[in-house]
Amino acid sequence: MTPVVALVGRPNVGKSTLFNRLTRTRDALVADFPGLTRDRKYGHANIAGYDFIVIDTGGIDGTEEGVEEKMAEQSLLAIEEADVVLFLVDARAGLVPADIGIAQYLRQREKTTVVVANKTDGIDADSHCAEFYQLGLGEVEQIAAAQGRGVTQLIDQVLAPLGEQLNADQAVENEENSANEEADEWDTDFDFENEDDTALLDEALEEETEESIEDKNIKIAIVGRPNVGKSTLTNRILGEERVVVYDMPGTTRDSIYIPMERDGQQYTIIDTAGVRKRGKVNLAVEKFSVIKTLQAIQDANVVLLTIDAREGISDQDLSLLGFILNAGRSLVIVVNKWDGLSQDIKDQVKSELDRRLDFIDFARVHFISALHGSGVGNLFDSVKEAYACATQKTSTSMLTRILRMAADEHQPPLVNGRRVKLKYAHPGGYNPPIIVIHGNQVEKLADSYKRYLSNYFRKSLKIIGSPIRIQFQEGNNPFAGKKNKLTPNQLRKRKRLMKFIKKSKK
């Protein structure tokens, strides 16, 4: 299962800043005053080759009343959910009584805890951090979350031991970086116009990713808000009353893994607990269910996002959808309870879906009734299609041809008067498909052009139901850092020009 890392500490020590840095988002509000984060926030992160779920919490200072007391409860529950706790302290403010109280609680819970001294930029970090050793929680890691300094080393140190404890299941190698690094070596030695050379590169890259798509057992996670019919859909798919169904939100508390076979294909159905608004999550057991659901998404190959047709799509559905896309999982949207609706209401629901889900037009949408079984059988065609698209193998020569066709139809923009040059593309991984594009000044490409390339690759490769990740790799400049040596003739010409310039100034 995916490790869970909780960020806890006093208010305004930089927990939300670190959360945004780890998840590479701006999901957590950040401001220079305490108490801004009032609830737990979950995010997906991939740092130093490790996939994990990170939880941002409100601050604890021991004087909570009213809403602050609820914030403290959220933080304590996050500690219970986590595999590792990052206890953030303020290096500039030094050790305060609230830090000592939090440390005492963490020792009592016997949680794996790492003390992280934040805001170490611009100060003598070693001397400022020395007093935090009094907390008795081991080494003190020094970071500057706002600048990103020390964050990668922190995660590597924190999750490496955890990966060993969990049989290294969570210590997933970062395929993207390894593919990029290897491609740099090929860049200088091989001709990408030559099919024999590109075949060699494809063979090398295929060895890295072959194991990841070798397993033909397709894992399907059924997720959504409470009481949208996830367990009913699971039972309809299985043809038996395998999971408890009741017309009350929150019946399913844990993720249930159920193996099955259909038309010779092995599947694992994952029925999950409903994910509702954080403000409505009250029971401790339900809070654990949210984590289990997010971990099930990470573990799945294809996710069925189930929506109640009678309630429409909510902000919580969109939040869950964002987590699915960030995790890179294939997606099929299931609109349940479609039976019994009038045609006018059906038209309204379809219009609302088109409006709010226009950014994921690559996903299939199915209108079903899990209770009566209508439309359920067609789901497997979309599941197999999405899985096949997510794991299909493409060659370097094909991706490079598509890249050049895209550049011919719409040239890359000028940057500082120079045209961005896109040299070649190669596969960087599967599930989801990763395309690595090499070129010059590619880091300066506008987001609009990156979206154009993503859509062009999707259309050309006919990828349905799976997100695409495009990585940009700057080409090696053999002359970078080297001083230009002039020939004797060039030196004499330079001297004559300098004399001419000096005379013209007089």
Curated annotation (Swiss-Prot):
GO terms for biological process: ribosome biogenesis. GTPase that plays an essential role in the late steps of ribosome biogenesis. The keyword Nucleotide-binding applies. PROSITE patterns: G_ENGA. SUPFAM superfamilies: P-loop containing nucleoside triphosphate hydrolases. Residues 3-166, 218-391 form the EngA-type G domain. Keywords: GTP-binding, Nucleotide-binding, Repeat, Ribosome biogenesis. It comes from Actinobacillus pleuropneumoniae serotype 5b (strain L20). It holds the Pfam family MMR_HSR1. Associates with the 50S ribosomal subunit. GTP 1 binds at residues 9-16, 56-60, 118-121. GTP 2 binds at residues 224-231, 271-275, 336-339. This is GTPase Der. Belongs to the TRAFAC class TrmE-Era-EngA-EngB-Septin-like GTPase superfamily. EngA (Der) GTPase family. The gene is der. Residues 392-476 form the KH-like domain. GO terms for molecular function: ATP hydrolysis activity; GTP binding; ribosome binding.
